[in-house]
Amino acid sequence: MSWRLPMVALLASLASSAALADSLRVEGAHVRAVPPVSTTTAAFMVLHNEGEADRSLVAASTPAARVAELHNHVDVDGVMQMRRVEAVPVPANASVSLAPGGYHLMLIDLAAPLHEGDEVTLSLTFDDGQTLELEAPVRRIETMNHDQMDHQPEDMSHSGH
């Protein structure tokens, strides 16, 4: 009879760990395509925490780069600057976007050039030690070209020139 209590505690612990593991989900992961001479790029995605506990992304790694760091853009005296951060908070029952201009994963000192269509293995580590492995396609990030800009007639006045 004395073995039942420790066994129940162990099973409850395992079930709790499994529930935490199932609470995190990654969506839309991709790596920015860069020119072949570039040694740095970034990975973007949406982190979903469907659990009841706050979580934090605390580290990342990839065989595609020597260094993978968590970064964010912050306003410093009116100038946006990219800064390394120790963690990306992922609140309970919420989602956090890793996107251009905000949190993102910097891949530094690329092992080889990345081409559009390549797949990059990413390993994401969270504050509880859980690691999520995923494949992220390399994609070209579209930028707005001149034809996509919203030009209003008053904006196009060249008077005084």
Name each model feature, range by range.
Residues 15-18:
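N-terminal signal peptide c-region/cleavage motif recognized by signal peptidases
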Residues 1-7:
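Bacterial N-terminal signal peptides that target proteins for export
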